[in-house]
Amino acid sequence: MAKEATRVRRRERKNITSGVAHVNSSFNNTMITITDAQGNAIAWSSAGAKGFKGSRKSTPFAAQIAAEDCAKKAQEHGMKSLEVEVCGPGSGRESALRALQAAGFMITSIRDVTPIPHNGCRPRKKRRV
């Protein structure tokens, strides 16, 4: 018996006008997730997902490309305004933010949510290069 052709599921259009962009920028990669107000993911992208490998993932250009891709996906769902939460010490923070702004989003607030210890755990040893 021949099996039925599988149908390709299209992404549902969610029609959400405002949301939160979480920009997680580590030393190795930059990940951008756009969520609604409750935290449900609407669109996501990262430098690695856009085809950058190795040390190129940590560049500001890779973060910009990932942010543009994520913005395009979110705009398909009717997203217009964003609050931005930036986390991490990486080099892609500012360029991802600029790319989101250039994509046509109205950015209402920018928050830095990088966790900073109040002298908690002992840090790992310093690198000697």
Curated annotation (Swiss-Prot):
Keywords: Ribonucleoprotein, Ribosomal protein, RNA-binding, rRNA-binding. GO terms for cellular component: ribonucleoprotein complex; ribosome. GO terms for biological process: translation. PROSITE patterns: RIBOSOMAL_S11. It comes from the Bacteria. GO terms for molecular function: rRNA binding; structural constituent of ribosome. The keyword Protease does not apply. It holds the Pfam family Ribosomal_S11. InterPro entries: Ribosomal_uS11, Ribosomal_uS11_bac-type, Ribosomal_uS11_CS, Ribosomal_uS11_sf. Belongs to the universal ribosomal protein uS11 family. HAMAP family: Ribosomal_uS11 (MF_01310). Part of the 30S ribosomal subunit. Interacts with proteins S7 and S18. Binds to IF-3. NCBIfam families: PRK05309.1, uS11_bact. Located on the platform of the 30S subunit, it bridges several disparate RNA helices of the 16S rRNA. Forms part of the Shine-Dalgarno cleft in the 70S ribosome. This is Small ribosomal subunit protein uS11. The gene is rpsK.
